[in-house]
């Protein structure tokens, strides 16, 4: 009887381990959770949300611009603002009223409008902003909204009981482009440093094309576990976006 009980317990343990492993490896099905004419929000992982707003340009038309919201507990961190204050207000309201979360920080990943165009809305809600010292300097020169808190190469912030990071790997799309990462979902926010599959080189007015591929190679080496890679514009995917970007600028 004792041996039978031990065998039964062992079988239960094996079933539990298998079930837990299966749940952990089950693919997440993305779902759109908010849409207006100015902002679309899609849940792309358990605690990661893609936000898309729009920027009217002379050369590329009305461009969709990506950003990321990561969550743990009742706190979130936002990578890149929506492009305008009104769409930023929509995002802030959605996080507050639908997710029931506090925005701990917003992190523009470089100094262009598609990263910090809606920054003033966050400041009006007393949400602290963080960016590299280079981004702050370039934003001032370009008369853009200016992030409040600076860092040199690496920023690590708590969100709930987890961490989110922003890190400078080198020049590419701009002198100041940083990459966001949220390890609990293995999600990378590459911003405009990373291109969607089949994208053109895009705007190069502030780029360092000679260094671009080498910078992305460093990103790839730093985050071998990344499962979701989000470019600044267009469709997100996996690490194939890194490989595509590396080849595009070689």
Question: Residue spans of the language-model regions?
Answer:
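Bacterial Sec-dependent N-terminal signal peptides
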Residues: 1-25
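Extracytoplasmic/secreted envelope proteins and their assembly/folding machinery
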Residues: 67, 88-92, 116-119, 213-216, ...
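Active-site metal-binding motif and surrounding structural segment of the metallo-beta-lactamase
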Residues: 74-77, 86-130
């Amino acid at each position: 009887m004792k041996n039978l009980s031990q065998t039964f317990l062992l079988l239960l343990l094996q079933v539990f381990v298998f079930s837990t492993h299966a749940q952990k490896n089950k693919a997440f099905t993305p779902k759109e959770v908010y849409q207006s004419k100015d902002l679309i929000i899609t849940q792309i992982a358990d605690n990661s949300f893609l936000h898309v707003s729009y920027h009217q340009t002379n050369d590329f038309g009305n461009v969709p611009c990506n950003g990321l919201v990561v969550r743990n507990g009742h706190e979130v961190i936002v990578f890149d603002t929506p492009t305008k204050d009104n769409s930023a207000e929509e995002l802030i309201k959605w996080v507050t009223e639908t997710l029931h979360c506090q925005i701990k920080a917003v992190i523009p990943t470089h100094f262009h409008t598609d990263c910090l165009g809606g920054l003033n809305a966050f400041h009006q809600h007393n949400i602290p902003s963080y960016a590299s010292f280079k981004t702050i300097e370039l934003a001032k020169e370009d008369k853009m909204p200016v992030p409040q808190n600076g860092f040199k190469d690496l920023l690590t912030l708590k969100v709930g009981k987890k961490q989110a990071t922003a890190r400078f790997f080198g020049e590419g799309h701009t002198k100041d482009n940083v990459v966001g990462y949220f390890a609990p979902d293995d999600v990378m926010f590459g911003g405009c440093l990373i291109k969607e599959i089949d994208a053109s080189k895009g705007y190069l007015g502030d780029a360092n094309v000679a260094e671009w591929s080498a910078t992305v190679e460093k990103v790839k080496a730093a985050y071998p576990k990344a499962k979701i890679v989000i470019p600044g514009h267009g469709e997100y995917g996996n690490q194939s976006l890194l490989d595509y970007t590396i080849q595009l600028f070689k």
